[in-house]
Amino acid sequence: MAPLKFCANISWLFTELPEFPQRMRAAASAGFRAVEAAWLYNTDLKELKTAKEETGLEFVLINTPPGDASAGDLGLAAVPGREQEFRQGLDLAVQYAKALDCTRIHLMAGRVPAGSERCALALQMEDTFVHNLKHAAGVLDKEGLLGLIEPINSRITDPRYFLHSPHQAAEILQRVDHPSIKMQMDIFHWQIMDGNLTHNIRRYLPMTGHIQIAQVPDRHEPDSPGELNFSFIFRLLEELDYQGFIGCEYKPQGSTEAGLEWLRKYWRSRNGGERD
């Protein structure tokens, strides 16, 4: 079985450093060969490219812009009436992805509009989401990029986020029916919403294009106290021959570097200490 590949989410890790290029260099020094990030759009693209060239890091994933974050936006793909803004954000994400040789873009669904009930808008939001994803599929297919949709739990993290379970995401992917759109499996969110991880991982891995991890419930390192046995989960993913990256999207309990012993232990157990 091939060892799993991990990437550092530099929106969550190495935040001891203020700038993304600095975090990229720190990630490379810590042994990572790849990184991902949420929103890089306030960082000069030339600086990101320079850091990438200096470190040799692979950029694995970025998100589409959130919209107006100050007004509570967290993505626009499923928000009725915001289709043009979504397309503009997608174009910007594609520009950054192409410049950074990043092949995956998380197409953020967004939140149920404030003052509205989820049940009242569910069908309209799903139709909007499917419509926007079909548009995105055409754009991404031409560019050789992969779009991802990620369920974010609505029990704890974000009660208003529209896409909140893997089952809902799978139904939407069936409606979109395009190989350029897949699922982003965040095991933290999946455990909170549904549990039953072994079954759900087996069931949905074939339609998954990226994985992210954090311990439940506090979203710290995988080896911190919590509900999940990551040794078992990693072995399961190896047995299922998962070939993609696993994003480390968690809140370090202390310094990022001190919290990476779980990863070094994994590298030692699989590669004799060599990172993959």
Curated annotation (Swiss-Prot):
Belongs to the hyi family. Keywords: Isomerase. One of its GO terms (molecular function) is hydroxypyruvate isomerase activity. The active site is at E150 (proton donor/acceptor), E249 (proton donor/acceptor). It holds the Pfam family AP_endonuc_2. It catalyses: 3-hydroxypyruvate = 2-hydroxy-3-oxopropanoate. One of its GO terms (biological process) is glyoxylate metabolic process. This is Putative hydroxypyruvate isomerase. SUPFAM superfamilies: Xylose isomerase-like. Catalyzes the reversible isomerization between hydroxypyruvate and 2-hydroxy-3-oxopropanoate (also termed tartronate semialdehyde). InterPro entries: HyI-like (IPR026040), Sugar_Epim/Isomerase (IPR050417), Xyl_isomerase-like_sf (IPR036237), Xyl_isomerase-like_TIM-brl (IPR013022). Coiled coil: none annotated. The gene is hyi.
